[in-house]
Each structure stands twice: as C-alpha cells, then as structure tokens.
Amino acid sequence: MKIPLKWLKEYLPTDMSPAELAERMTMAGTEVTVLNSRKDKWPNVYVGQIMEVNRHPNADRLVLVKVDWGQGQETVVTGAPNCKAGDKVVFARTGAVLIDGHNGKEMVLKPAVLRGVESCGMVCSERELGLSDEHEGILILPADAPVGMLASEYLGEIILDLELTPNRGDLMCVTGVARELGALIDRLPSISTPDFKATGKDIKDKINIEIKNTKLCTRYTASLIEGIKIGESPDWLKERLIACGMRPINNVVDATNYVMLEFGQPLHSFDYDQIKSKHIIVRPAAEGEVLTTLDGVERKLSPDMLLITEPDKIIALAGVMGGENTEVTEKTASVLLESATFDKHSIRRTAKALKLQSEASARFEKGLSFELAPVALKRATQLILEIAGGQAASGLMDVMPVKKDRNSVVLSLSKVNRVLGLEGEKFDSCKIAKRLGFAWMPEYVPGMEEFGYGSVDDKMRFFPGYWRMDIESDIDMIEEVARIAGYDTIPCLPLDKAIPKIETPPLPGIKRFLRQILSGYGFQELISYSFTSREMLSRVFSGAEPECLAISNPMSSEQEVMRTSLRPALYASLAANRRFEKNGLRLYELGRIYLPKENNKQDEPEMLCALIAGSASEAWWQRNTAGFDFFDAKGIVESLVSRLGIAADFAVSDEPGLTPGYQAGILVGDMPVGVLGQLSPQTADKFGITEPVYMFEINLSKLITRATVRRKFTQINRFPSVERDLALVLDRSITNRQVTDIISEFDLVKNVELFDMYQGKQVAEDKKSLAYHLLFQSDTHTLKDADVDSVMNQILKRLNTETGAVLRS
C-alpha cells in the first residue's frame, strides 16, 4: 500500500522525518519503506522558464521557444499552443528518456532539425512525462517552481510503502495510516465527518433499492448527482492517484478512487440514465448468467456470486467490477454513487473464480465495517460536486435490513500485566485506547473474580473504532496495548526459576535414524490405516485370529478392528505392486499396533515391519539376477540393530503365517523383540502372492531400551592384518553364533566370517563342518606368525572345551 507523505500530513501534521516515521510504524508491526515516487525517473529533465516565444521562419504551426534551465539557455522547436513567456515548464535535454506522445513507448531524446531549425531539447507535456494521457499542450508548472531543479525532485513525492499484514485492512487508506501514526505519537488526527450540500429533489423519488440476500450484503447506500460535467480531474487529484499507483480516468471515477484511497471504502459510479427501471436489486447470480465488465470481457457467473442488477439486466459484479452497460462516459449527465458493505468471503471467492483482483475487491476481502459506507459516500458526493459540478439529490438511500451493534471487548487490566509479564501498572490501557480512538466504560460481571480477573474496578469494556474490524477479543486488545506502548518498553525480567531439563524421548530420533538407513538400503516406506478387519488378520496368521480391539462405529467391515500387526497392509501392498509387474520390492512401515490387555486397557507398541521379494539386484546381461533369500532378510536385521549399538541373537520360533524351518525369533540378550522368516505358501496364496517373500517385524518400544545412536570414533589401524582359515567338525546342534561368539572374544581377532558349511559322507551323520575366514590385527605392532599361531591354538582349545569342536583334517 502506497501513501503519499504530503497527503498523510494533511490529516496528521508532524515534523518527523520520513525515516523516523517509517521506523515507528515498523516497530509497531507494520513494515514501512520510504520511496521517492519519481527518483531517477527523468535524467536530464529540469524545471525551466520560457524566456522568449518567436515564430518559426519556415512553419506556421511551430514556434521557437528559448528556455532557461538554470545552467544555460536553449532554443526548442515545438508545436504546443500554450507556450507563453514567463511560464515555468519541464525542459528535457538531449539524452533524456521520455514517453513518445504518438505511440506511448519510451524514447531517448536526440538532437533534431525541424524545418531547418535545430531543436536542442524539448518542453514536455504530461503524456511525455508519463503523468497522464494529456498531450494537447505542454505542462505549465506553478510560478514558484525553482528553475534548474531536477524535475524528479520537484514533481516527485515522498511515498510510504506499507507491507500490510492480513488483519490490518484499516491501513489500506490514508486516514487509517493517520490514525495508526497518531496513536503511536500520541496525537489525534484531524479527520472531520464529511457532508455535502443537497439542492435537488429527494433521492427516494429517484431510485429504489432492494437487498435479496442480507447475509452477503448487510448495507447498501447510494447518492445521486445530476447535471454533472464529465472531464479531466484537477492536477492535484491526478498526481495523488498516480503516486498511489492508480491511473486517472475522468473526474467522477477519479473521485471515487480518491475516496477509496482516503477512507478505505470502495465505491462505484453508475450512469444513472442507463438504469432505466430506477430499481436496483442486490442478489446472487443465477446459473448461466453473463456480464460484460468494464474491461470489455464477457464473464460467466455462478450462483455464489453477488450481483447488482435491475429487474431485467445485470449492471455490476458486487464489490469487484462494474458492468459496461452502465459505465460513466463523456456523455454521462447524472451519476448514481454506490457505497455498500459486502460479505468478505463472497467477494474473495468471486474475485478468485473470475481471476479479477481489483483495488475494490482487495479491500472488501479484508472486511469493512457497515458504519464506513455512508461516511465514504458523503465524502465522494462532496468531492464530485466540487470538481464536476451538478446538483445532489436530497438525502441518501440507506438500506440496512439487519441493525448491528458495534463490537466490544471486555478486558481485565490485571490480565494485561499477566500476559505481558509486567509488575504493577506499567501501561495505562485506557489512555492507550483513547490514543487509538476507542471508547471504554467500567464493566462488572458478578461471580467472575474466581477466574483470576481481579476486582470489579479491574474490568473495562472497550469499544474499538468501527475501522478496526480485527479487534475481536481481549488478547487482541492486549496486543494493541503492547504495540502502541512499544514492545521495547516491556522490561526484560530474569526467570525466577531454573529451566527444567526435559529429556527428549528417544523413539522419534530412533525412527528417523531407521528411516535413513532403510532408505539407503533401497526400501520404500508405506503408511497405512490403523484399522483392519478380522478376516485380514486371520489370513496373515494362517487362520489363527489374535485378540484385537473392536471399533464401536467402524466406517466399513474392512476397518472393524485396530491392527495387531503391520503385516496385513504390507502383504496387500506387495500383492498390488506385483500385479503391476513391479519387481525387486523392498517395503517397510513404522507405526503402532494395538494389543488388548486386562481391565479394558491396551498396549500400543511402536513396530517396524519390512519385507523383501523378487530380484535382489537389477537385471544385467553379464550375469543372472538372484532373488532375495532368508539370509538377505537376516543380514538386514543384523545391520539395523548393529547400527543402534545392539547385538541381535536368533532363536528357533514357531510363528503362525511363516514357513517352519525358515523363520527365527529375534532376541536382544534374553528379551524377544521380533520375528524373521519366509511367508508360508498358505498365507502367500491367500494374498495372491506367487513368489518367495521374506519379512521381519521388530518391536521398537522394546528395542530402544537397549539402543544408542551415539557415534564413536575409531582410529584407523596402521598395522598390517593376517588372514587364516579355520575348518571345524562339530555337532549339528551347535550354532554358528556359538562359534563366532567364542572366536570374537580374542582381542587380536578383528573379523570372523563363515564361508562354508558341509554335511555329508566326509563327516559323521550327526556332525557338520563349518569353515571360517579369520582376520587378525594388532593395534600396537605388526603380528608375527608365532603370535597368530598362539591365538589359533587358544581358539581351538576353547572351542573344543565348550562345543566339542575339532580341527577338520
């Protein structure tokens, strides 16, 4: 929002510099930038004075004008009819950038010879300066214009550019900014109540107004001016519109735009003679209706749009844009002015649907008080009578079907201190309310003292000005008190208590960590509903129906119970993806399951469930792609838990829905935390899955009690390593984990890797052979063969003693 400083000072005289003014408003919550409207716009353009005007020797319609521009005199050839010696003009030297008066494009002024006489510059019209479309003659400046001053400085205007927040629609006008600044500097602005002199007949005999939707239009006011003369606006009015970023059109339209910028209330002017029925109806659009708006575009309307109509035609799109059929033109003799209050939501929807954002709709969208409509209407009528003449009909048409009271807010003065952290009466809320233009009175509501509002004298009822539609509660009022008093005046108080140390729950961090790891492994995350069906759970667990929590009002039979496992959604998703021929799938889900407990309570552990199926790698012509197997899933589990600083063990399990012999329980110490295995053929068939699927499900709520994601620094070993192979014969009941745990206890052993297992004729029937790669390395010196041999002998003795293993010959 752009506000000319000179205009603002007409309502609030102040000696503050533009920078100080901008700083005060910015600190109060409205960011302000100071601009010069024409700074650097006209290089080489100066205020000049015509010294002589002589006839052109070779052309009757041209004259020779000698111009003094402060640093010398130049002769200019021009055809302007209004050149007169002594006039102050705008003189452009060679190199100036102006607007071509014929095509409206920018041009660089060059030396020219016109009918045999050299012209060294130009005396400029308003159009050539980009001020308006006027091109009939040159721009004549006031007699006190200083010769030699840059035109950008003389014609320029200090502009305050406001960055408005959505709730401050009251600052979209000069008077609103004057009120805001006045409150900040404790000076009431001079804003008088406008009125006009009526000399015509009663307006009620001239027009009838009917509102058919009182929710979308709460007030409609109108005035009538007859016998006006449409023409150009005065220079001062045009300049202010241009400074605010608006284009002058004619005196009537310019007056309505001027008042909108002045008071914030959009107005619209109709050609009264084009309203044949003299009956205006405010109603919603009907399906299929169309309107050609002022921009010449035919627009299709919908029933949620509000219209201004006659009984037989549409004449305007309420709050957005007028219709072409009642446009004010040069032939207009009588004008009907509209100033109304429309529903902000309706205007926003209409402007958005038609992609027709206008200055009017921007203001209506923020919400306007019903009290503002007649104020702006009187001011616009007054201004048009001044600049366009005519006679105003007596009175105003004012239709307001539902009478409204002004909003009020009850505020406990002690609450101001509590919210702002003050001690004692730091701020005088009533005095600040007066600076804002608000009224107030004592308030007493019996029985409210117990809620902490203080004594009876502590309560006040505040009545915000009609222009402040954003003040709706006591918190809004407290914000105003702090804003106007100054946030920087609120004292900084040390905390009277130490800030308690709050332990961060480990689970969210663990889940983020696991997501990163699984994404790195190529997994995709699934997020499913927490609801499922008994039938789905029965399919997952091979007919065994686990106890589950039933939903009292399920949306469907497929969402009748809370899930007791994450597997159903993963299996269903896998089957759906395989139908679309997706191969090499890796899916996981992190989420809660819901297990019933005694006394109508439930356990809600966080779980991680994942599955792999299909090819383990992408197809490659040089080798066949292998599918996932049980040990791929086991390796992923081991990697995941090891990244959390945990060592996982595996034990024989008998989990329903998994293949016997191809499943294992996951243990941390002696605590079961999950299950791992291959989907049983029966379960896979129930989901339409035809390939091997391997899954694991881990109870994270249990796992995190042993987890740590702290990273430890490990120095890179500078000494060489030694590799040895070890082949053992041992009972089939001995597991690989038992062997590797014993070997890993020796300090010099850095890695143990099983590379072969044999069961057959070369060993006894109840025996098996396991072969290992062992990596030896010292942190302090280079190992010798004797060092490694000694450790190998110790390993064999331990294995023989604890497992009965012997060296395979």
UniProtKB/Swiss-Prot annotation:
Note accompanying the cofactor annotation: Binds 2 magnesium ions per tetramer.
Cofactor dependency: Mg(2+)
Keyword Cell inner membrane: no
Gene3D superfamilies: 3.30.56.10, Bira Bifunctional Protein, Domain 2 (3.30.930.10), Ferrodoxin-fold anticodon-binding domain (3.30.70.380), Nucleic acid-binding proteins (2.40.50.140), Phenylalanyl-trna Synthetase, Chain B, domain 3 (3.50.40.10)
PROSITE patterns for the chain: B5, FDX_ACB, TRBD
Pfam families xrefs: B3_4, B5, FDX-ACB, tRNA_bind, tRNA_synthFbeta
One cellular component (GO) term of this entry: phenylalanine-tRNA ligase complex
Protein's recorded name: Phenylalanine--tRNA ligase beta subunit
Subunit-level organization: Tetramer of two alpha and two beta subunits.
Keyword ATP-binding tagged: yes
Any one of the GO BP annotations: phenylalanyl-tRNA aminoacylation
tRNA-binding domain location: 39-152
Compartments where located: Cytoplasm
EC number: 6.1.1.20
InterPro entries in UniProt: aa-tRNA-synth_II/BPL/LPL (IPR045864), B3/B4_tRNA-bd (IPR005146), DNA-bd_dom_put_sf (IPR009061), Fdx_antiC-bd (IPR005121), Fdx_antiC-bd_sf (IPR036690), NA-bd_OB-fold (IPR012340), Phe-tRNA-ligase_IIc_bsu (IPR045060), Phe-tRNA-ligase_IIc_bsu_bact (IPR004532)
